[in-house]
């Protein structure tokens, strides 16, 4: 780690010219290993995204020696008949190199991030990466808007465009050649850039950090067209937690690129002047909302398509951008079904001896839990059937009782924690009921007993020990509100420590 810190202090003129040599440094692979170990966060289970169980310094040393001896990376050749290298699978070494590659390629962007902070009073907050930070923004802004553009983020016609764009940031030719080698080696770029990414286990487990970096760089390029929008649009809360580039360019990209776009598109900007335009991104989609007319939204739609295709060479089609009216649709994003609905209320106005009853209707953001997809996920994980009837989990009956309770408790807390912002809690209570009864049936199956006799013998209190409600947690933090727990259970609660949704979607 000290060696990396010394490297980061190098002169900026040399920062991008000697990255390839870092592949032969052992501490780079140790950093990639530590990234996988420190991935976990509160209320989330740790995913083994790297080669944690197989990592050792001896394997890394053998890998480096082999790279020194070879003129090219034969160890990554999938066409080779020999799938073992020094007693280990070649996939492991390919994986290790790609993880180390991801650590190295972030160095120039880390230097730019540090330099962007110098001489500026910018608040450094980890809350910018929270998924829940998006919803307070929606509550404040969306209720005053009319239309929304649902955009599927376009992807490059060829991954060589990504390499060409990176040449502006990285000047090490050997490093860029290695990047091309990796992209041709995996030859599955379309699955990575589209929504089929989840189906490709290679990107999910073995090379996640490497491909997420490339994906975020691609998204940054596609989003740079919004740099000419009003300055307040730049200060939206970040919705991407893994995006190293988002943090790097959150402040820096405004200064470097806005002059270029002003020069290129000043003749068209007057068509799209809209002080109420807002933008945010989630997963592989993005949303632009406005208070303007449908005609203005259509102009934005075709302007974006033409600009992506002609200026950035990104493949896009008009049918990938949908125009909807906020009052007529549900936005399905980040695990919630969100909509803007009128909220009528009656106000009594007293003026001297006269009293007036005034009906007021204000828009309110409604956030609902999607019950059908959640039950589908629970059924896929064998916690219930497709109709939502809880069943036992036979695969866990070999574990200790405490381990079984801990597993069910963790899943229940994850769901409760993430969906604490739901407007209606009944759906959330149903999910909790399924998990509780599935846990009881799993324990009863293990002890060859019925659920009723098992609960009667041990009591139902043992389930309450790990299924802690949100209001009980808050009662420890804010004792004054413990008396109004019934009212609190109906309130929406947003947390700023949730930076992943994968565990909640896949359970």
Swiss-Prot record:
GO terms for biological process: mRNA processing; RNA splicing; tRNA processing. One of its GO terms (molecular function) is RNA binding. InterPro entries: Domain_X (IPR024937), Maturase_MatK (IPR002866), Maturase_MatK_N (IPR024942). Keywords: Chloroplast, mRNA processing, Plastid, RNA-binding, tRNA processing. It is found in: Plastid, Chloroplast. Pfam families: Intron_maturas2 (PF01348), MatK_N (PF01824). GO terms for cellular component: chloroplast. It comes from the Eukaryota. PANTHER family: MATURASE K. Belongs to the intron maturase 2 family. MatK subfamily. Usually encoded in the trnK tRNA gene intron. Probably assists in splicing its own and other chloroplast group II introns. This is Maturase K.
């Amino acid at each position: 780690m000290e060696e990396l810190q010394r490297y980061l202090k190098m002169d900026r003129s040399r920062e991008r010219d000697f990255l390839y040599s870092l592949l032969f440094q052992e501490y780079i692979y140790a950093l990639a290993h530590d990234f996988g170990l420190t991935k976990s966060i509160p209320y989330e289970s740790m995913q083994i995204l790297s080669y944690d169980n197989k990592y050792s310094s001896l394997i890394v040393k053998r890998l480096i020696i082999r790279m020194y001896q070879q003129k090219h990376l034969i160890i990554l050749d999938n066409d080779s008949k020999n799938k073992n290298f020094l007693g280990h699978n070649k996939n492991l070494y390919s994986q290790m190199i790609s993880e180390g590659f991801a650590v190295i390629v972030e160095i120039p962007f880390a230097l730019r991030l540090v330099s962007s902070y110098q001489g500026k009073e910018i608040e450094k907050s980890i809350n910018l990466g929270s998924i829940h930070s998006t919803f307070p923004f929606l509550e404040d802004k969306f209720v005053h808007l009319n239309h929304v553009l649902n955009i599927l983020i376009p992807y490059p016609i060829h991954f060589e465009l990504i390499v060409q764009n990176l040449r502006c940031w990285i000047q090490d030719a050997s490093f860029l050649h290695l990047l091309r080698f990796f992209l041709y080696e995996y030859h599955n770029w379309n699955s990575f850039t589209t929504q089929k990414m989840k189906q490709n286990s290679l990107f999910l487990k073995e090379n996640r950090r490497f491909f997420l970096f490339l994906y975020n760089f691609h998204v940054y390029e596609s989003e740079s067209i919004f740099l000419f929008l009003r300055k307040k649009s730049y200060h939206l809360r970040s919705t991407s937690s893994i995006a190293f580039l988002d943090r790097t360019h959150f402040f820096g990209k405004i200064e470097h690129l806005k002059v270029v776009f002003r020069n290129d598109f000043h003749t068209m900007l007057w068509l799209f002047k809209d002080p109420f335009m807002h933008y945010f991104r989630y997963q592989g989609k993005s949303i632009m909302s406005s208070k303007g007319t449908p005609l203005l939204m259509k102009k934005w739609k075709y302007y974006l398509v033409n600009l992506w295709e002609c200026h950035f060479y990104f493949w896009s089609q008009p049918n990938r951008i949908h125009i909807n009216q906020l009052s007529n649709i549900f936005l399905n994003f980040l695990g919630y079904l969100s909509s803007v609905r009128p909220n009528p209320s009656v106000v009594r106005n007293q003026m001297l001896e006269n009293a007036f009853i005034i009906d007021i209707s204000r828009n309110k953001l409604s956030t609902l839990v999607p019950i059908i997809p959640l039950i589908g996920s629970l059924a896929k994980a064998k916690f219930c059937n497709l109709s939502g009837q809880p069943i036992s989990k036979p695969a866990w009956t070999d574990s200790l009782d405490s381990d079984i309770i801990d597993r069910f408790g963790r899943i229940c807390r994850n769901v409760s924690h993430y969906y604490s912002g739901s407007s209606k809690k009944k759906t959330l209570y149903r999910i909790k009921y399924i998990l509780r009864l599935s846990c009881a049936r799993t324990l009863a199956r293990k002890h060859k007993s019925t659920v009723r006799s098992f609960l009667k013998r041990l009591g139902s209190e043992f389930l309450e020990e790990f299924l802690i409600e949100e209001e009980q947690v808050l009662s420890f933090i804010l004792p004054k509100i413990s008396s109004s727990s019934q009212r609190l259970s109906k309130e929406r609660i947003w947390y700023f420590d949730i930076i992943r949704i994968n565990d909640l979607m896949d359970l």
